[in-house]
Amino acid sequence: MSKSTAEIRQAFLDFFHSKGHQVVSSSSLVPNNDPTLLFTNAGMNQFKDVFLGLDKRAYSRATTSQRCVRAGGKHNDLENVGYTARHHTFFEMLGNFSFGDYFKHDAISFAWELLTGEQWFNLPKEKLWVTVYETDDEAYEIWANDIGIPRERIIRIGDNKGSAFASDNFWQMGDTGPCGPCTEIFFDHGDHIWGGPPGSAEEDGDRYIEIWNIVFMQFNRQSDGTMLPLPKPSVDTGMGLERIAAVLQHVNSNYEIDLFRDLIKAVAEVTGATDLSSKSLRVIADHIRSCAFLISDGVIPSNENRGYVLRRIIRRAIRHGNMLGAKETFFYKLVAPLIAVMGPAADELKQQQAMVEQVLKTEEEQFARTLERGLALLDEELSKLTGDTLDGETAFRLYDTYGFPVDLTADVCRERNLKVDEAGFEQAMEAQRRRARESSGFGADYNNLIRVDSASQFSGYNHVHQQATVTALFRNGEAVDEIHEGEEAVVVLNQTPFYGESGGQVGDTGELKNATATFAVADTQKYGQAIGHLGQLTHGTLRVNHSIDAQVDVARRNRIRLNHSATHLLHAALRKTLGDHVAQKGSLVNDKYLRFDFSHFEAMKPEQIRLVEDMVNEQIRRNMPVQTEVMELDAAKEKGAMALFGEKYDDQVRVLTMGDFSTELCGGIHASRTGDIGLFRILSESGTAAGIRRIEAVTGEGAIALLHQQSDLLQDVAHLVKGDTNNLADKVRAVLDRSKMLERELQQLKDQQAAQESASLSSNAKLVNGVKLLVSQLDNVEPKMLRTMVDDLKNQLGSAIIVLATTADDKVSLIVGVTKDLTSKVKAGELIADIAQQVGGKGGGRPDMAQAGGTNVQALPSALASVEAWVASRL
């Protein structure tokens, strides 16, 4: 009996755990602190800083099953998903990693044992082929001599991509940095499937499928192309879970493995489809995986960056559901079946299920309003095509008006053997794309970050003042030996009480000082293992190795820590009030206020906001001790500690506990007791995106200041309405009622005035070619009264052309009315356009009524004088 996908995942992790590897949980699909990546797309992403030497772990061997998304940017597989056997937007990457521990021999031996061992995957040895980099004799000989693979099944692959070291079998992180050769393992599905071994002319066939890539990081590539050996070579491997599942379950397509079979059945059930071989079922089954996990990890559909990629995937799935005959919203209904088939790998998704379903349902309902009309327009345009390519302007119009991502339009065209002019589409999109680029941090050069070789010992949990030594200085991003008065710089110390910004808490400010220099710290940031103090030298000269007195701004620090502790109470109160789907999606904690973003699918009701506020204040009054404990990450999770969105944790973590009310992982600085917070007041609750709400609040001194401000405002209002704060509501209601009554009376007077004006005006009408024409400039008449006057004059004159104008605040207001019997000859919209352009304005309307505005008051008399000739020319 073949292994299930869940069993394969667990077997991989168990195998490497037995080989001394730390099992590390999958990181978020939103890369942490890496601006070069749109989404996590490989197992090594979460270890990138380790490979770069910017981070250290307590272990030197690790294994993971990493959730990955490839859709958008360099790794854009979207158009192929559902149409090929192995393309996905979402997949799991099984990996094992060595950080300066074992190297080629053990990495290859481990892979072979797992793949062929009877108690593990037990694959036939004769079915396995391998490739190595052309000059990697060491790996070649390990495969041939130690493992015993026949040399005819070991293929050397050289530089096949146009330049030195540009090869399928040579991996590099970038133009510079860690790199090295790799060896790949292929499975031969048999001669009943077309294709040749890697390196052959038929290598793109489906017979020989790559199942494992093992990268040997042994060089550090310099900017001049020189390859310097790394002092501690490392290993990074990746094996697609879905690919190895297809091999072990004896199927040729990833969509035939147990996980996808069950998902495809669920898709068929919610859409009413009967043909289980439909490619649309495969598209939807794939897309629910990426969409659900992306939303769970904090990505929300939008028109920019990650949110736009998510929106494209969702809308592609919805369109394929439409093709299958789905008549109502269906996509969100697949979250529950997805959780069922993913098993333990979906534990975090299960906690967010209600929120994920709501976001998907809302997005589907919004798109459904335009999908049918957009498809009708596309059908119409395609029916008029004389060639085989839809122009880019039409593709852009579908995107701009109906929300059709270009790949959805390309999907429709593909089914009709047509293409889309994507270059033309990109040209039409340039303004939006430029705006997105300017507002995003993607594409930043990772190497531009300050590289600090030293580490800083943080002492700020217990101290706000400390003697320290300057270990590094940076000016304009470059390391220097000294800085001088007036210069801005980053100062790194061997130990510091200053907190570096992280976890939503802003960095400390304060002062670094000795007998000869004073450095004003405006911010504190983390640089790998070092803590950098950003600011300006206000006096003297500061050099590396100088002793320094580090003093945190204590008053500011105290306000920050109270706000930070309040966010934990707020988080717990929200979960107790709204449900367990609530999860932190971001925060800002500074000395003035706190901002807390969380997952929830609708605006909070006023009574819910009050309940949350009361609950937090109750915990403050309980004056519970705020306790911290350092423990293993797994132990903390077993204790029920919640991890915060987007935060990266070490193996040893700080667990913050506030009585029995809140337990979370947090490395920030906090109050000693909840009572220190004093008071908590919510300023606002709002939405930032679909499925994401935001609360802003103040504590302590800030909350008291808010109460004083509100009290002063009440006193001012009470004075204005000649009452007191005890009966203020009644007084305000009385004032509003009287105001409404006076407004009604005023409107009645204005109507009477307009009627009187109209009655007197009607006698001024003159005959032009037998038609009554009335042209008049009115004084002291509000622009909004002109329409009422035109209607009155039409009734009085019977058949007529009426032009009225008034001025106010150096602006012209115009209106033209034409009775319906005359609109075949004189159209109000045409007449007013002629008048408006003379007074520096524009306008329009129906043939019988049109309005306009202008800015040239001085030109109004001559413009009105021209009306008679214009009308005469039309009659």
Swiss-Prot record:
It catalyses: tRNA(Ala) + L-alanine + ATP = L-alanyl-tRNA(Ala) + AMP + diphosphate. One of its GO terms (biological process) is alanyl-tRNA aminoacylation. Binds 1 zinc ion per subunit. It is found in: Cytoplasm. One of its GO terms (molecular function) is tRNA binding. Its main location: cytoplasm. Keywords: Aminoacyl-tRNA synthetase, ATP-binding, Cytoplasm, Ligase, Metal-binding, Nucleotide-binding, Protein biosynthesis, RNA-binding, tRNA-binding, Zinc. Its EC number is 6.1.1.7. Disulfide bonds: none annotated. Its cofactor is Zn(2+). Zn(2+) binds at residues 564, 568, 666, 670. One of its GO terms (cellular component) is cytosol. Pfam families: DHHA1 (PF02272), tRNA-synt_2c (PF01411), tRNA_SAD (PF07973). Gene3D superfamilies: 2.40.30.130, 3.10.310.40, 3.30.54.20, 6.10.250.550, Bira Bifunctional Protein, Domain 2, Threonyl-trna Synthetase, Chain A, domain 2. Homotetramer. Catalyzes the attachment of alanine to tRNA(Ala) in a two-step reaction: alanine is first activated by ATP to form Ala-AMP and then transferred to the acceptor end of tRNA(Ala). Also edits incorrectly charged Ser-tRNA(Ala) and Gly-tRNA(Ala) via its editing domain. HAMAP family: Ala_tRNA_synth_B. NCBIfam families: alaS. Consists of three domains; the N-terminal catalytic domain, the editing domain and the C-terminal C-Ala domain. The editing domain removes incorrectly charged amino acids, while the C-Ala domain, along with tRNA(Ala), serves as a bridge to cooperatively bring together the editing and aminoacylation centers thus stimulating deacylation of misacylated tRNAs. This is Alanine--tRNA ligase. The gene is alaS.
